[in-house]
Amino acid sequence: MDGRDKPGHDGTPGLDPKTGKPVNYNPNADMQVYNEGSHGTRAKPKGEKLCPSHNGGKNWEPSAYNPDLGLLYIPSIEGCNYIELVEQKDMVDQGGPVKPRERFMGGAPKTPDRLYGSLKAIDPATGEIKAVQKLEYPNMAGVLATAGNLVFLGHYDGTFAAYDAKTLNEMWSFNVGSPIQAPPVTYAVNGKQYVAVLVGARMWPYIIQNAPELKNQMTASMLYVFSL
């Protein structure tokens, strides 16, 4: 949105910082014309490489903001996947897989390489990345920032960790034994502060296919509460 140059290839050379629309957007065209070579093609046997992957970098997982430090904490998914266009011959009228009123994804992404994660502290006023914590697994959970300058984040291997709000160095961790995809919350009772997080989540195949150590992970649903 800031109009700065970006790596890789996209359907547009950039975004208009005022409107948020592609700079080559034509309001009078019925169909927008993409940059040549930016769309998928059947000419590449391996498919078209997309970076970040279809689920990342930043997805729906909630970010958090520390107003005292002026930092935004963003959980990200690091990695790429491939999109391959395959000719579809069997459609509804031929008895194919597309059925009325049933969900159809049109295919699934190919993720031949392992996906990782990262936690970033960003100055939202300038876009400058102040700190980065590289993570072993993709981030599927949200972030919590506290007034005590701690940042909490759960991970796919069941690790629930606290990081320093300035450096993002890990300060504490505890493995709950089940994947974490929920954002933690904090509250106080009689002057005592607590942090709670729901655990237990579906193991997404595109993640565990290249992380075999996660295949035997339990997916029990539980609520964990920690005191500060």
Which ranges hold each PLM region?
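Beta-sheet-rich non-transmembrane sensory/scaffold domains
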Residues: M1-L228
